[in-house]
Amino acid sequence: MLPEQWDTFKRAARLEKLERIPMALIVDSPWIPGYLGIKHMDYYLDPEVWFEANLKIMREFPDIIFVPSWWMEYGMAAEPSVLGAKIKFWQDNTPSEYHTLYRLEDIDNFPEYEVEADAFAAMTLHRYGMHRQRILDHGYILPLVTSRGPLCTAGFVRSTTNLMIELVENPEGCHKLIDLCTRVIIDWLKAQHKVIGDTVEGIFILDDIVGFINEEHYQEFAHPYLKRICDAFPKDWVKIYHNDAEVDACLDYLPDAGFHVLNWGKQKDIREVKQRVGDRMCLMGNVNPLEIGVRGTPEEVREATLDVLEGSGGEGVILSVGGGTSPGMPRENIVAMQDALQEFNASRRVRVGARHG
């Protein structure tokens, strides 16, 4: 991400009126290796391949704000690996996570964690430290530190199925696990900030498992922990939340948790989301990422993009797909989104000019 792109993103996050709606995409290892024709293992384990891949993407699409920017990740492995989850790697896919907390009460026997030294968190920090100055020398910045959320992490450590059952059958044990995951996440974000330095001005939290629970369980098992994470960082930092599962139960509470930007899934029309939280959050979405973004024609992408933009009312929005960029999304469909946005921004300027003419 370029400094001027981050400035635009911050202004959008604060619901400032912008002359043009910006476009941002969440890109990481589910999409980048396949798009560039490289092996996932090379992307993860060869520092030069990782650096050149990210540089190529940013140069190929200079007008798109890539979030979180130079994201060093091993799929979803870093956070659960700190707490002992088993990680399997594949040549042509992201890693798989397997739970190792077979009984919830065994959490009392967990060894103390240390994010700077533990598993894939330590490897991630090393890569950031290795390439930080090189990234800056190319004119880019690293404005965001990133983590999976507390329920997502807990689900990998205990298994999502077991966690869902135990929210009902053993709420006390679940609170203990989610509290531990929250502490890991806060320390993990702070460790990234320490390595990356003073270009960091925001956090990016991804937690789809929040979308698996009802409103009552959200209030008890998710909201207090998400708020703790947001409260652990400066008030003027931008806080982004991603959940491309169902957001109905949590949507109205996310601004109170401390989030400024919401990236949500294809399930809920932007008009409803705008009506419910559009005066309190910037909406980053929500072109259907799979059926349209990957499988659609450029014309279908154009139509879907214009529908999202019209539904947004042209304010308080950052154009994106509904979630992360899906594996297999082709260049022509990304360009179709850009072209539709340019078309919308041009017509918007004409309409605004006519009102003031």
Q: Predicted segment positions?
A:
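Membrane helical hairpin/interfacial module
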Residues: 55-79
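A contiguous, low-structure linker/loop signature
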Residues: 71-113
